[in-house]
Amino acid sequence: MVKVIASSLRKGNVVDKDGKLYVILFAENIHPGKGTPVTQLDMRRIGDGVKVSERYRTTEQVERAYVEEREHTFLYADGEGFHFMNPETYDQVAVSEAVVGDAAPYLQEGMPVQVSQFNGIAISLVLPQRATFEVVETEPTTKGQTASSSYKPAVLSNGVRTAVPPHIAPGTRVVVMTADGSYVERAKD
């Protein structure tokens, strides 16, 4: 364990609080006009998945645990969880649904994913920033609508709802951000 100041903590870091380990889901440094700057952390306890919010003064010392980060390839999902393989050692890791969380719909077979492990237990994962999916359902474009920069609702092949430009039709492959499902561009493949 290493002591660090609270303002240096980021998403994915593991901290020791009262003898229990927590993975940081969200970290924000807040500088009010009056008063002491603070770091707001949303964390999930490793082991039972309880979510906790904490506030630390930005200069306060916090125990950060060493986490091993390795690239893995997503294989499949089943009743036991989501299965990933280390491409160097061919070791497989099962990751629980609680750890995968909102990233589940964006996982595609063969997708490279950063898996963070603490003492051999997967505690968090980071997807690539962008992923490509097919549009399965969207409204038809009405004449004259193409000149405006308005977006229309669409459903992707992974079930995620997003907004796409009017020229996108069902069957078109699009690139979306895995963080929020927002449209980036039409796929070039």
Swiss-Prot record:
Which family is this sequence assigned to? Belongs to the elongation factor P family.
- Chief site of localization: cytoplasm
Compartment(s): Cytoplasm
User: Cellular component terms, GO, for this chain's entry?
Assistant: cytoplasm
Q: Which species? A: Mesorhizobium japonicum (strain LMG 29417 / CECT 9101 / MAFF 303099)
| Protein name, UniProt field | Elongation factor P 2
Give UniProt keywords alphabetically: Cytoplasm, Elongation factor, Protein biosynthesis
* Pathway(s) of this molecule: Protein biosynthesis; polypeptide chain elongation
**Any one of the GO BP annotations:** peptide biosynthetic process
Keyword Nucleotide-binding recorded: no
